[in-house]
UniProtKB/Swiss-Prot annotation:
Organism phylogeny: Eukaryota, Fungi, Dikarya, Ascomycota, Taphrinomycotina
Biased composition (Acidic residues): 154-165
Function: Involved in the biogenesis of the 60S ribosomal subunit. Ensures the docking of nog1 to pre-60S particles. Activates and recruits ATPase afg2 to cytoplasmic pre-60S ribosomal particles.
Regions of compositional bias (Basic residues) in chain numbering: 174-183
Name of the protein in its database record: Ribosome biogenesis protein rlp24
SUPFAM superfamilies for the chain: Glucocorticoid receptor-like (DNA-binding domain)
A single MF term (Gene Ontology): structural constituent of ribosome
Compartments in which it is found: Cytoplasm; Nucleus
Keywords, alphabetical: Cytoplasm, Nucleus, Ribosome biogenesis
Keyword Nucleotide-binding: no
Subunit note: Associated with nucleolar and cytoplasmic pre-60S particles. At the end of biogenesis it dissociates from cytoplasmic pre-60S particles and is likely to be exchanged for its ribosomal homolog, rpl24.
InterPro entries the UniProt entry points to: L24e/L24_sf, Ribosomal_eL24, Ribosomal_eL24-rel_N, Ribosomal_eL24_CS, TRASH_dom
Family of this protein: Belongs to the eukaryotic ribosomal protein eL24 family.
GO cellular component, one term: preribosome, large subunit precursor
Amino acid sequence: MRVHTCYFCSGPVYPGHGIMFVRNDSKVFRFCRSKCHKNFKMKRNPRKVAWTKAYRKAHGKEMVYDTALAVTAARRNVPVRYDRNVIATTLNAMKRVSQVHAKRERLFYKKRLAGKRAQELQEAQKLIAQNVPQFTEPEGEVETAEVQEPQIVSDEEYTMEEEVAEPVKIPVLAKKRKNKKSRNSSSAMQMD
């Protein structure tokens, strides 16, 4: 089973899926979904459309080239004679390649997000510097807060305070409703 790649977003196009467009010069374009086909017809550049792999790689959001994957991604159209030893080594190599790729990807994302924390901190400091009056308390309030001492309340006083506070009932006036009969009779009189 051959899995093609989408010309626009570089996603996988499985057999029986997607759209294939063949130009007059017999150049074949495969698209995974109508979204990609429409963007291609609008002559959009995949490197400038944010959700494509080309954009992500161009802007340093994904690894550009991984040599570990180059071995598995190569196409071999010429059949090779079966050899048990070769198959065993390739299976081991495939497992190893996936481990190496996963490790490299983790390191790439860690390195990519490492500067994010420092950048957020810097932006927060800049915001505070711009809005100094908002983030600082007035001097009068600071002094009164320091002068007040915490009061220690015994359990007995605490329970007495709770008992004193009783819920206050507020009467709610309900609207008076008219009978349906009285409404009907009044409307009948108006019609005559």
